[in-house]
UniProtKB/Swiss-Prot annotation:
Subcellular location: Periplasm; Bacterial flagellum basal body
Coiled coil: none
Organism: Helicobacter pylori (strain J99 / ATCC 700824)
Signal peptide start-end: 1-15
Main subcellular localisation: periplasm
Subunit composition and interactions: The basal body constitutes a major portion of the flagellar organelle and consists of four rings (L,P,S, and M) mounted on a central rod.
Family of the protein in this entry: Belongs to the FlgI family.
Protein's recorded name: Flagellar P-ring protein
UniProt xrefs under Pfam families: FlgI
Chain's gene name: flgI
Summary of the function given for this chain in its UniProt record: Assembles around the rod to form the L-ring and probably protects the motor/basal body from shearing forces during rotation.
Keyword match Disulfide bond: no
HAMAP family linked: FlgI (MF_00416)
Keywords, sorted A to Z: Bacterial flagellum, Periplasm, Signal
Amino acid sequence: MKRVFLWLIFVLAFHKLLAEKIGDIASVVGVRDNQLIGYGLVIGLNGTGNKSGSKFTMQSISNMLESVNVKISADDIKSKNVAAVMITASLPPFARQGDKIDIHISSIGDAKSIQGGTLVMTPLNAVDGNIYALAQGAIISGNSSNLLSANIINGATIEREVSYDLFHKNAMTLSLKNPNFKNAIQVQNTLNKVFGNKVAIALDPKTIQITRPERLSMVEFLALVQEIPINYSAKNKIIVDEKSGTIVSGVDIIVHPIVVTSQDITLKITKEPLNDSKNMQDLDNNMSLDTAHNTLSSNGKNITIAGVVKALQKIGVSAKGMVSILQALKKSGAISAEMEIL
């Protein structure tokens, strides 16, 4: 029987003080991307475009030809070399007229492939209805598994800028990426210590209002703020991707002694040393596993998620079974951490 293992990746260290820059844990409110969207046509396809019965595509071709003074009814157009597509893009903050941005193209009709075609000039609109960019370009993609979508690097040119006067602002707002009362106060106190009292004030667990010192412009102030190191507290969290079989966890999340049963699997977690037996295996970090009785011992020390997952792998538990056991441990209170199942 094929065994499915989950790989335990320790890339996050939770529930401890972590040294980071303020710019890594907080964003500046108002400084963000804006989403753009447009409807267009991809031409030059070798019979892989929308079928002639696709009325909205034929009408779009007719409208495009009419824009260049070629009048023809949509009913008279018979072509499989054109595909109707939607174009999406992100307009970065402070993008200037003439800048280039990447675009993503997706077929919306019954085309078989848009690879090798050319996107004709397409306006990209924001939620306010205004045109902010024009998209156009050849579609070249090495992704043979998906023939109905593609990216064009620098495929759109900015035509309209989002007006935002940062230079003359006196106050801005920082938004913590992971809201936390302690972290908000930590940012407030750190900034006040560096720049002087009343520069920063925490409004809630997520929001810190900052006021620039008179000697600095807002651009200079934010540049300094983002580089200031800070110790912040992150939450204990376990993220489980059941499809890919990946568990992301802090290295020091403790699992308390317990007996957990899920489906046909029972695992005993204890700090008591195991009796020597031919079924006992030594794991890392002074842990031992009795495979005959599914008992995991830390030999007097704390057991972590790492040890539990390794033990489950040793006794041949499937990916689905591991997820079920981790959920049972969380529900029973044996794990003091948030759990997110993807």
